[in-house]
Amino acid sequence: KNPWSVPYWQNLEEAYTRAMRNKGHEFSVGRVTYMYDGQHLWYALPSGRILCYPFAKLEADGVTYAKAAWKPAADATEWPRARLWKGLACENITQATANDLLRHALRQLDDVVLHVHDEIVLETDRPEEMAEQLERVMCTPPEWAKGLPLGAEVAIMSRYGK
């Protein structure tokens, strides 16, 4: 249980709601910034990557957006809508930031054969050396994530497994 999580969620909700009410203005929470352009709700991650809740609307019960990842019915005239709530906003930021960290690590490594969620798999004839490098790379945050505590559990295996 993290005592900062509930206030952070509330601050996120306040920021994206204020952005929806103030077209063209930016509202930040920590290192995340929201901006509504009149059609889409955009948010900038600490890495600088920009993500979007498409066709966002401020409704009586909160913010909704077009859930483009869902396949609509064949006769549907528009994408289904989903409700943006503070926990989902936090989850989206967390998952996207984790992805940015993974991609940062991948760009620094040779011998990568695959990655699964938060795991990186290397194939090498220098396992001990590469295990040390992998841990060092995965535990060193990029400039935009300075101060973020990172950890990695590295294992040497003859084939991929859990």
Language-model segment annotations:
Residues K1-K162:
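Conserved catalytic core of nucleotide polymerization and phosphodiester-bond processing enzymes
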